[in-house]
Amino acid sequence: MRVLVLGSGVIGTASAYYLARQGFEVTVVDRQPAVAMETSFANAGQISPGYASPWAAPGVPLKAIKWLLERHAPLAIKLTGDVDQYLWMAQMLRNCTASRYAVNKERMVRLSEYSRDCLDELRAETGINYENRSLGTTQLFRTQAQVDAAAKDIAVLEQSGVPYELLDRDGIARVEPALAGVKDILAGALRLPNDQTGDCQLFTTKLADMALKLGVEFRFGQDIQRLDFAGDRINGVWIDGKLETADRYVLALGSYSPQMLKPLGIKAPVYPLKGYSLTVPITNGDMAPTSTILDETYKVAITRFDNRIRVGGMAEIAGFDLSLNPRRRETLEMIVNDLYPRGGDLSQASFWTGLRPATPDGTPIVGATAFRNLFLNTGHGTLGWTMACGSGRLLADLIARKKPQISAEGLDISRYGNSREVAKHGQTAPAHQQ
């Protein structure tokens, strides 16, 4: 059985790998010249199942108003006049209740924990190396109010059986010695010892190499134009003016997924959350982080690779704008100087931006659609790296009609009440328009 995977980020590549392991004949198509060249290229590098949380949370609407007035705010909104932007933000606001937050976080943690287990198994089986570490994640709180607010997340961790440790200032210095000199500006921390780190782009490249050995074909530099459909089946995909056919189709185009699905009558509430990162060469390893640090105040992660520090985070709701905002670089540099002033050489840092495909409830869209041979693996937001292996394996099981190792409840697009609307055949814009 032939499967055509659209998109070669970490999600599409993981989908292809796990499908090939189950014996499918897989082809991956992407407009870029190689895998992981867009959102997967320079993300924060953290694999943090326990910190899998939706942006839509109680109190966020009021915080967002306050953040609009702050220079180093973790969230910024640039209104584009796009109706989809307004609809997505309205849906996000509806998810900012305590009850919906709990449901959404449980779904995210469920998939993230499974994904971490899949990654562990993959690493044990293949020895894949991607500058990975298994030294946990430490979430830093600068105020006592932040420490107190972590109680709701701890309750979900306990419910899900995720190990954690609350740290005082001395405890922070114990697990992250380079923070000993600045511990007085911190109120405490929450540490998840089972979390991991690694270079997502390097991982995806090596996973693609392993997929090639399983017979997966990668076709780069090709324009994915539209899906051809009739009734409840996909007939093929128009790629560079030619109709390509398969038995099953997987859409893993990140933020560009809705453009492909809209002509089919499928409304996928996926919208780009623009994020930024700095990659900083390490000059003093003893003054750099040992693993991943999350700064709760600025929503920024600082991650240790072998000889580099990756600083990533923030979110701009600004459509498909990929311009580099110098104020965001200023914020990232400020945080590094605040916590690790002697760890790396900021003058040699590389600055990057990417569009994370976010859903309004934070949970990705993984699973079947109203079309019998079309499957989705998209909408992972800031957690594509964390959820990649689990999402790919889950999707492969669903396509193979095998019982997944975790519950898929609440993960597919049907949770939005997404009944297919009548759509005109073949009328769509290129899925990769910018």
From Swiss-Prot:
It comes from the Bacteria. GO terms for molecular function: D-amino-acid dehydrogenase activity. Keywords: FAD, Flavoprotein, Oxidoreductase. GO terms for cellular component: cytoplasm; plasma membrane. It is an enzyme of class 1 (oxidoreductase). Oxidative deamination of D-amino acids. This is D-amino acid dehydrogenase.
